[in-house]
Amino acid sequence: MITSKNEAAYLDLIRYVRDHGTEKGDRTGTGTRSHFGAQLRFDLKDGFPLLTTKKVHMKSITYELFWFLKGDTHVKYLQDHGVRIWNEWSTAEQTARFGRPEGELGPIYGHQWRNYGATKAEDGRYNQDGVDQVVEVIEQIKSNPNSRRLIVSGWNPAEATQVALPPCHTLFQFFVADGKLSCQLYQRSADLFLGVPFNIASYSLLTHMIAQVCDLEVGEFIWTGGDCHLYQNHIDQVNEQLSREAYELPKLWLNPEIKDIFDFTFDDIRVEGYQSHPAIKAPVAV
């Protein structure tokens, strides 16, 4: 476990995996350096954990989170807002493997969050008879904050083989104490260079949003990774990032008038004081 007030903990983790990770093959054929089991903690009162040693695209993070919360599984919403991070998995070639039209990703995050366990109609579409985990967890945080069941699961074993990319960030749990909301994410598969910086910021944003609509302050965001890996073709980029000095973390502003998680818009969220080094490009392993 590593705790830090900025991204030093993350940088220590990628340095450790670069230097000590086990070389392994992987599904994509790219090859990785991997380490099993890691944890990072961020006190959200100390700043919003958007990495500064490389520029991270907050617009993509925000719209992807909105997309999950909508229960949407088609990339049109993302593409309409200029977000391309799911394009590689939404091609006609990828979706045809599962009998779906181009752009339709199937029962991934949004579906599992908002309609878990839904049945299918005769036309293959999902009925709206599943569990709305987002609504339920918010109701439980408000009515039963001491519950140890404040959990949302994106992992459905019955459907994990029916999508091109099964959920990597699989389960998150909330914890309420002293008027503060904390969140822990378990990520089964952690692409440390490209994916994890997005995941840290996304779930930190979600924690802020849910805390606000539940009249709570923010506590910690805790990231727990299973297979934590660096792709072999990201090592040069990791070296470049590790050569940079981190800046202070920015602050997050949310429109205080918003009291329903589904009412947030892009203009209701603002990252203030974000100073970063330039972005570092790296290939995506599909």
From Swiss-Prot:
DUMP binds at residues 27, 148-149, 188-191, 199, 229-231. GO terms for biological process: dTMP biosynthetic process; dTTP biosynthetic process; methylation. Pathway: Pyrimidine metabolism; dTTP biosynthesis. GO terms for cellular component: cytosol. InterPro entries: Thymidate_synth/dCMP_Mease, Thymidate_synth/dCMP_Mease_dom, Thymidate_synth/dCMP_Mease_sf, Thymidylate_synthase, Thymidylate_synthase_AS. GO terms for molecular function: thymidylate synthase activity. (6R)-5,10-methylene-5,6,7,8-tetrahydrofolate binds at residues 57, 191, 285. The active site is at 168 (nucleophile). It is an enzyme of class 2 (transferase). It catalyses: dUMP + (6R)-5,10-methylene-5,6,7,8-tetrahydrofolate = 7,8-dihydrofolate + dTMP. Belongs to the thymidylate synthase family. Bacterial-type ThyA subfamily. Keywords: Cytoplasm, Methyltransferase, Nucleotide biosynthesis, Transferase. Its EC number is 2.1.1.45. Disulfide bonds: none annotated. The gene is thyA. It is found in: Cytoplasm. Homodimer. Catalyzes the reductive methylation of 2'-deoxyuridine-5'-monophosphate (dUMP) to 2'-deoxythymidine-5'-monophosphate (dTMP) while utilizing 5,10-methylenetetrahydrofolate (mTHF) as the methyl donor and reductant in the reaction, yielding dihydrofolate (DHF) as a by-product. This enzymatic reaction provides an intracellular de novo source of dTMP, an essential precursor for DNA biosynthesis. This is Thymidylate synthase.
